[in-house]
Swiss-Prot record:
Entry protein name: NADH-quinone oxidoreductase subunit B
Catalysis: reaction(s): a quinone + NADH + 5 H(+)(in) = a quinol + NAD(+) + 4 H(+)(out)
Root EC class: translocase
Annotated organism of origin: Sphingopyxis alaskensis (strain DSM 13593 / LMG 18877 / RB2256)
Keywords: 4Fe-4S, Cell inner membrane, Cell membrane, Iron, Iron-sulfur, Membrane, Metal-binding, NAD, Quinone, Translocase, Transport, Ubiquinone
Role summary: NDH-1 shuttles electrons from NADH, via FMN and iron-sulfur (Fe-S) centers, to quinones in the respiratory chain. Couples the redox reaction to proton translocation (for every two electrons transferred, four hydrogen ions are translocated across the cytoplasmic membrane), and thus conserves the redox energy in a proton gradient.
InterPro entries linked: NADH_UbQ_OxRdtase-like_20kDa (IPR006137), NADH_UQ_OxRdtase_20Kd_su (IPR006138)
Entry superkingdom: Bacteria
Biological classification of the source: Bacteria, Pseudomonadati, Pseudomonadota, Alphaproteobacteria, Sphingomonadales
UniProt-listed NCBIfam families: nuoB_fam, PRK06411.1
């Protein structure tokens, strides 16, 4: 459409979910749901993430919060404290000396907590895979929910990973993980 900025592929919210909600509210004038589903719906729109930027992928985390991509339009906002955050984004090479700190920060997060592993180094060690000091994937230290591939992944890839996490929360709920 003229006058609209082009939207990067994969950065629109789950349109079918919102169409179903608006259709039900439009037909009946109200929405019937369970408390658990209501909490899951609210949780997907208010994810507070904590950065665990270890290397060059952290620059893309900064990039995704700038006006061009504006991650806050999906209800995802950064927090400085692990006690206030629901999501941890691990970006970069995880060394053996940093692994206990990662676990400690993860343990300080409140439940339910989710982890996004961002980049080749966080996913499996990346370029430094065979080094004696590198953990071959942060999933050996903390449970990972979403893997975002790339070296470094683009801002669009991280946004897509966040949207996949929102879909996973809606699909599985908070009790099953």
């Amino acid at each position: 459409m003229p006058g609209q900025m082009p939207v990067a592929p994969g950065t629109n919210p789950d349109q079918s979910f919102f169409d179903d909600l608006s259709g039900e509210v439009g037909d009946k004038g109200f929405l019937v749901t369970s408390t658990e589903d209501l909490f899951n719906w609210a949780r997907t729109g208010s994810l507070w993430w904590m950065t665990f930027g270890l290397a060059c992928c952290a620059v893309e985390m900064i990039h995704v919060n700038m006006p061009r991509y504006d991650m806050e339009r999906f209800g995802v906002a950064p927090r400085a404290s692990p006690r206030q955050s629901d999501v941890m984004i691990v970006a970069g090479t995880l060394c053996n000396k940093m692994a206990p700190a990662l676990r400690r920060v993860y343990d300080q997060m409140s439940n339910p907590k989710y982890v996004i592993s961002m980049g080749s180094c966080a996913n499996g060690g990346g370029y430094y895979h065979y080094s004696y000091s590198v953990v071959r994937g942060c999933d050996r230290i903390v449970p990972v929910d979403i893997y975002v591939p790339g070296c470094p992944p683009t801002a669009e890839a991280l946004l897509y990973g966040v949207m996949q996490l929102q879909r996973k929360i809606r699909r599985t709920g908070t009790i099953e993980r």
